[in-house]
Amino acid sequence: MELILGSQSSTRANLLKEHGIKFEQKALYFDEESLKTTDPREFVYLACKGKLEKAKELLANNCAIVVADSVVSVGNRMQRKAKNKQEALEFLKRQNGHEIEVLTCSALISPVLEWLDLSVFRARLKAFDPSEIEKYLESGLWQESAGCVRLEDFHKPYIKSSSENLSVGLGLNVEGLLGALKLGAKLSSL
């Protein structure tokens, strides 16, 4: 069965590649600005459901589509993608030395199965080096990440402790997705 990643995220694409999952990447447009909630869990769930509805429009026989959305929560305050460098700096100041949560809602739809998962990755952070913050902001890497969180590079050396489910922190529950894909394969062979 052909798998489509309904996301432009290079991090999500890399996660699938690292797990040996073959896929085609296609952008799905869903207007997250239409969501009025400020609750991080509700927001990420509704954004993923919206993307899932868009995916249903693309769904063809013998095709499965995976979508996901992530937000960061610091003290239950939602951080989405920063709109500019000043907002990025404010996000990083709130995260500095605190616990962050990356809430990721992942979903799969196929002709035989619909799977949706909301998971949380938690990390306790050490204080950021101010000169590294400046370099990070200048690099522009923060622009495509919810809450400017990049566990694969900038945030990595500052993690004091974290939960085990790193793929959730990177934006896709790969372990859950693998289980859903196996179940889907079994169901389609019946």
From Swiss-Prot:
SUPFAM superfamilies: ITPase-like (SSF52972)
Enzyme class: hydrolase
InterPro entries according to UniProt: ITPase-like_fam (IPR029001), Maf-like (IPR003697)
Residues at the active site: D69
Primary residence: cytoplasm
EC number(s) per entry: 3.6.1.9
GO cellular component, one term: cytoplasm
Reaction(s) catalysed (UniProt annotation): a ribonucleoside 5'-triphosphate + H2O = a ribonucleoside 5'-phosphate + diphosphate + H(+); a 2'-deoxyribonucleoside 5'-triphosphate + H2O = a 2'-deoxyribonucleoside 5'-phosphate + diphosphate + H(+)
GO biological process: nucleotide metabolic process
Keywords, alphabetical: Cytoplasm, Hydrolase, Nucleotide metabolism
Compartment(s) of residence: Cytoplasm
Record family assignment: Belongs to the Maf family.
NCBIfam families per record: maf (TIGR00172), PRK04056.1 (NF003141)
Biological role: Nucleoside triphosphate pyrophosphatase. May have a dual role in cell division arrest and in preventing the incorporation of modified nucleotides into cellular nucleic acids.
Designated name of the protein: Nucleoside triphosphate pyrophosphatase
